[in-house]
Regions:
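HotDog/MaoC-like acyl-thioester-processing domains
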Residues: 2-9, 88-151
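Hot-dog-fold acyl-thioester-processing enzymes
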Residues: 1-82, 147-151
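Conserved interaction-surface patches within small, structured recognition/assembly domains
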Residues: 84-86
Length: 151
């Protein structure tokens, strides 16, 4: 189990590659973002995106899964106080392979909850061509292993 002390600035967690499947793009869009470019190949080709494209929210959800698989599920996480920024830099198309990493930007002990550390991270998702498709700046609240901890 990882604790706050395991998150010094500069620590990096790599994401395992994830294939963007057409059926998943369409299913997500049908439920949460029913726009033509997300619902069919023809709708995607007719758009400026050039093909069946994942919703930005779907891209964010895939990023969240990559975060969980790379470190969160093995961390004494107490959730997140929020996302500072979420940028969708390039269309994510059906058939793309996504990977990337997240890096600790800053870590400090909470002033109001001394047993909790606030860890700020930046996640960057890239496609199979190495192009950045999404960037997210966010924070995690992570339990400290010891009182008076330093990351």
């Amino acid at each position: 189990m990882l604790h706050f002390e395991d998150f010094p600035a500069g620590k990096r967690f790599d994401f395992k590659p994830v294939e963007v499947k057409a059926e998943d793009v369409i299913a997500f869009a049908a439920e949460f973002d029913p726009q033509p470019m997300h619902l069919s190949h023809d709708g995607g080709k007719a758009s400026i995106l050039g093909g069946l494209a994942a919703s930005g929210w779907h891209t964010s959800a895939m990023m969240m899964r990559m975060l969980c698989d790379s470190y969160i599920r093995e961390t004494a996480s107490e959730g997140s106080p929020g996302v500072d920024s979420m940028e969708w830099k390039r269309a994510v198309l059906a058939g793309d392979m996504l990977s990337g990493s997240c890096t600790v930007v800053e870590a400090r002990v909470s002033r109001s909850r001394p047993g909790i550390g606030i860890v700020r991270l930046r996640a960057v998702v890239t496609n199979q061509r190495g192009e950045t498709v999404a960037i997210c700046d966010y924070a995690n609240m992570i339990r400290c292993q010891t009182t008076g901890a330093v990351a």
